[in-house]
Amino acid sequence: MSWAQFRQGMDGRLEALAEHLRTGSWTSGPLREVAITTYTGKTIPSVIPTVTDRVVQRAMRGAVEPVLEQRAFADWVSGYRAGRNRITALRDSDRHLREGFRWVADVDVRRVSEGSTAAEVTDWLAEHVADGSFLRLFERVLEPLPCPLVPGTALAPLLINLRLSRADARLTGLRTVRFADNYCVFCDSTEQADEALGAITGALARCGLRPNLAKSKVWTGVNAEDLFLIAG
């Protein structure tokens, strides 16, 4: 079914969908698995859910996003958030650089959308949401996916931030800016930046993640515009 077809008699479709969700009779539709090729030639596994499933995913995201914005996401995190994008990350970075913190521990997270289960992701959400019936439905929505954070769903961007928020919470006291899955910590010496690199690595390890070593480094003499570049 296309979006155009869904819109025909949409009120009735939404009422029926709400009833299925309320009674527990809802089941997910078939997924179309695709491979997206980036401009650098890298291939990223992705999925295309049915229109109805995307409606469910968007509704669930709309329900939990305000809660996570208030309880889970740090002020220094941009990307996958309303009003917080690469521009806000660059502004925050420029402020730290202008204050004299010219050494940057720059860490890109390796395969952030891989290596989790529906039950595990639901446990992350349960740290902030106490509604048991919602959490059970949330887990049911994730279970058919090849990976709960796989690109292509309406929930994936939010869940990437939820996953990384668990590492973010371990980085208190540092001048940190994160854009999507890229951390930068601003320091006043090489030694401090090396320590920050270790702190990020340790925080990620506690969450089952690790840096992409090919894209992570300590550097200085950087302009804000050089940071958070998308390399595909």
Show the residue positions of the predicted features.
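Short, low-order "capping/linker" segments at domain edges
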Residues: A224-G232
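Conserved polymerase palm-domain catalytic core
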Residues: D75, L90-G221
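Conserved pre-catalytic core of RNA-dependent polymerases
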Residues: M1-V150
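Generic preference for hydrophobic/aromatic residues in regular secondary structure cores
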Residues: S28-E33, P211-V218, L227
